[in-house]
Amino acid sequence: MFIFGNKASKIAKCAQKGNGNPVVKLIKDPDMTVRLAAIDCMGATRCHAASNDLINMLQDPNADVRAHVAGALAGIGDVHAKAHIANAASVEKDAKVKEAMVKAMAKLKDF
């Protein structure tokens, strides 16, 4: 997909342009730095194309991924994600992730 530059710089450029669509597939990248940046980009650009994948990622084994996903879903403003975040929060054991999920649900009240 990317011929020039690294993935992180491409994500930053997409975020700057307000279009996360070109980097949606990077939310599943094996490099955690790339993955988290792509997840954050989805929220920053309100990329609805990533919503379903992000909802599924609320169950990711990595706590940082789950926390970033909650924030991204809130940034996207997908009100349908609120129930999924609430369900994930009800069983979440990591305090940092649970806090991110609670903040995400509060932010989604504004949509």
Where are these regions (language model features)?
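Alpha-helical scaffold domains
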Residues: M1-F4, I11-K17, A44
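Conserved hydrophobic register position within alpha-solenoid helical repeats
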Residues: K7-K10, A38, V69, M101
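Core register positions within helices of long alpha-helical scaffolds
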Residues: K10-K13, C41, A72-G75, V79, ...
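Amphipathic alpha-helical scaffolding segments comprising HEAT/armadillo-like alpha-solenoid repeats
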Residues: C14-K28, C47-Q59, D78-S90, F111
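Fold-core signature of tandem repeat domains
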Residues: I27, V34, M42, L58, ...
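Short inter-helical turns and helix N-cap capping residues of alpha-solenoid HEAT/ARM repeat scaffolds
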Residues: P30-D31, P61-N62, K93-D94
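Eukaryotic acidic, Ser/Thr-rich intrinsically disordered low-complexity regions
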Residues: S90, A95-F111
